[in-house]
Each structure stands twice: as structure tokens, then as C-alpha cells.
Amino acid sequence: SLEGRWVRVRTNNATPSWTVNLNPGVNNLTADNNTDIRQRTTYHAVNTVHDFMKSFYPSFTGLDFALPANVDLAGNCNAFYDGSSINFYAAGGGCNATSLVADVCYHEYGHGINDKFYQAQGFSFDNGAMGEGYADIWALGITDSPILGIGFYQSNPTGFVRRYDINKKVFPQ
């Protein structure tokens, strides 16, 4: 199945799976006929953000499990973390499938990091705007770019969701 240590990708409540026979030596495998690019992008992005998080918090184990990631949900132009999974809408409304944008995957998993990390400390964090900013920090750290969500919009491949290098908000200025 398209499940690893840190993510279980599902479409229509099903996890992609297939069987292959491996021979001793080098085996060339492809998942192209058994999964789609939305599933593979989500799988790769979640593993990337989990590894990035562990480089800062190696002893934090709150997300050391296969987090469900649901792709191609009904709706459009959004994604969300619900406390137990990350969820991505199908293409529509002028937006690409949100699972295709790695920054969106990093951001949603970032909500999970923030949620589980605060819980591990015995607290909760419910500030909406700050939560969005903190989730963005995980994506910004991975991409090392102030522009998040490039490729989000169908009609503008260079369009983005947020940009942090224009009209900077720096305290105390």
C-alpha cells in the first residue's frame, strides 16, 4: 500500500496497494500505474516534513506514526488538519488539487506538529492566525523561500498562496 512509517495516503477512503515480485539484485519499480501524482506528492511531502521536524525535535514522538492523509476530497481551494489526519481537496474552483502542492502538504502537517507538540507539553494552541503562521514556518523552513504555494492556481502556474517578503511585518517596527 502507499503507506510508510509517517503517512498513509488514501483516496476515496482507500489506500492504494499492489503486489510485485522482487528478485535478488536490482529491481526497477514504478508506482505510476498503481498510484497517481497526487498520492505520490503527498507521500513524499509528508515524509520530507516529518524528517525536517525530527532534525529539530529528535526526541519528540507525537507524530511518529503513519498519519492518514486523505486526497481528492469534495471541495476545492483548501486543505485542513483535523486533529487526526491531513486532508486535501480535489481540483476545482480555479485551483489545482491541493495535494499537488508540496508547500500545502508541509503546512497542513505543520498544524499537526504544532497540535501534537503542544499536547505533549500539556497545553493546547487555539489561536487561528498564529496557528496559520506557525504552520507556514514549517513550509518556509523546508523550501527556504518566502513564497508559499506556487502552483496552487490552475490559471496561473506561478501564482502563490502567501508571500512573506513583501510588506514584511517585523516587530517592533
Give residue ranges: language-model regions:
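Acidic/polar low-complexity interaction segments
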Residues: 1-55, 59-67, 71-91, 115, ...
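An acidic intrinsically disordered interaction segment
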Residues: 2-12, 96-106, 153-161
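Surface-exposed ligand/attachment interfaces on beta-rich extracellular proteins
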Residues: 31-32, 170-173
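Short pre-active-site segment immediately N-terminal to the catalytic Zn-binding motif
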Residues: 40, 88-105, 124-126
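Short, glycine-/Ser/Thr-/acidic-enriched flexible segments
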Residues: 93, 119, 142-145
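Active-site recognition of the HExxH zinc-binding catalytic motif
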Residues: 103-119, 132-136, 140
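Post-HExxH zinc-binding segment in Zn-dependent metallohydrolases
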Residues: 125-171
